[in-house]
Design a protein with these regions (language model features):
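Conserved acetyl-CoA-binding loop-helix of GNAT-fold acetyltransferases
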Residues: 110-113, 119-136
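GNAT-family acyltransferases
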Residues: 1-108, 115, 133
């Protein structure tokens, strides 16, 4: 049964496979400003190494803190991964506050389900599982 977990190096191989799926569907291009695209551009070249992937996981965890340096258009957010055993299925992020743009497009919660796991209710299940954390 899938579960919501903090980002972890435990699912590195499956996570990388999911990112390849996103690339195959056209994500990550210059005009794509999604979280997946930003991370593909920033970390895609280092995910294959244990050190690079650990650095990426640490960055996701640091993004939850207001004191973390970030681009002016980004806000603090807490990210959880949706996994089933060693399989990465998707992610969901809670933005701690909103910019004027996020008020119009984006909102407080953003999510991605890997293409091969779509149409199975994962987005609904992730949202249901993350709502208690969003109330904190």
């Amino acid at each position: 049964m899938p579960e919501l977990v903090p980002p972890s190096t435990r699912v590195q191989r499956s996570f990388i496979d999911a990112m390849v799926e996103f690339l195959d569907e056209g994500r990550g291009g210059r005009n794509d400003d999604s979280m997946v695209a930003r991370e593909l551009r920033e970390f895609g070249s280092v995910w294959d190494t244990p050190e690079g992937f650990a650095q990426y996981v640490e960055r996701l965890q640091a993004d939850a803190h207001e004191s973390t340096l970030r681009a002016s258009y980004l806000v603090p957010s807490t990210t959880y991964w949706w996994v089933e055993g060693p399989e990465y299925l998707g992610r969901i992020s809670i933005r701690h506050r909103l910019t004027p743009r996020l008020l119009e497009i984006g909102g407080h919660i953003g999510y991605d389900v890997r293409p091969s796991a779509r149409r199975r209710g994962h987005a609904t299940a992730m949202l249901r599982a993350v709502l208690p954390y969003a109330l904190e």
